[in-house]
């Protein structure tokens, strides 16, 4: 398996769990997925689509990641924990993009034309985020874990939620910015609401006993 220096460098820069380049080349699943995509993409561009799709199938079978060989991906592409990553045929991804596990860059149309997202440079897409349709995500954008993005996002924005909404743009908070490890959790929010209701009921019962 061949590894591009820029993709390997991205692993070393972005994944603190990797202690050496040798370790990354042997065991880093995301790097392996990117390498297999690069090989398949070259074959796809050369018109050897059957060979490209075979590599894609092998990659999906081994890793759980499905990056169509027709997708266009720039340099220094980093996938952390590749399982569940899906990138469609007409997706375009810029340079220095970070994708976490379970991310989907999908289509919402059955047409043969451009139907998947275009992602700019220096973008971070959090765990389980879904970006759908022929939309454009600008440069320097952060998409929070679990977000569902269905519309264009301008440069220098932070997006969270379902549907995805901009909470920060060009350094100005529109809502409270949330980090990758501090994003909305609907289940946890419901639990906290129930706890508050229980506490209130306890207070009412205590007052009745007096």
Model-predicted regions and their roles:
Residues 1-63, 174-210:
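Terminal amphipathic alpha-helical/low-complexity segments used for targeting or macromolecular assembly
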